[in-house]
Amino acid sequence: MLNILGRRNSSNVQKVLWVCDELHLSYEREDIGGTFGHNQSSKYLAMNPNGLVPTLIDNGRTLWESNAIVRYLCESREPHGLLPQDPWSIALAQQWMDWQQTTLGPAIRPLFRNLVRTAQQNRDLEVIAAGRNKTEAALRILDDHLSQHRYVTGNHFSFGDIPVGVMAYRWFNLDIQRAALPSLEDWYHRLTTHQAYRDNVMMTLS
């Protein structure tokens, strides 16, 4: 039995829950972080010294960093499911996972925090505008790629779609004006046909 430590409204936890349900893995989850706290306790820091979520416990072993957890689960539990079948496609999936962490995530994070987790009277409009512009610029890169591919690695859904798919839900559900990105929108709607996406990602932003 897998144990996942982390609150459901964390985008990084959502990645792990989504992949678990896609692979039909049994797990237990404990609310950690955010308003639930406990992520700075000595017990938790012994497992994840960053004090962040999620943390995965598998047979007494611990693993942190959400994208590493996603890769581990796909490689160890279901080698012919969400894991592409050739080294090039695996590398492409990893490329887009890394891009989510280094480019898309940092762009959308200030926008999300100001619009969702900050009282209206305390919101920084300049940060919101800059975040919207940076996120849109990043998503244009993905939109251009998806104009030639149904999913990030080609014609088949893979673990590479999961991190960017979580970010896409936030983008399409924030109260902002969005430029038309038709290939991105088509890909997003394909993701919404996945029950695991609806169950673990498509929730009220908080």
Question: Which stretches of residues belong to each language-model region?
Answer:
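Intrinsically disordered, low-complexity segments enriched in small/polar residues
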Residues: 25, 42, 70, 149, ...
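Conserved beta-strand edge residues that scaffold enzyme active sites
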Residues: 34-35, 160, 205
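Structured helix-beta-strand junction loops
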Residues: 50, 76, 148-149, 194
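Compositionally biased amphipathic helical and low-complexity segments enriched in hydrophobic
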Residues: 24-26, 140, 182, 206
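GST-like fold's C-terminal all-alpha helical module
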Residues: 88, 100-193, 200
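Short, flexible loop/turn segments with low-complexity composition
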Residues: 199-206
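GST-like domain detector, emphasizing the conserved glutathione-binding G-site
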Residues: 1-9, 14-129, 143
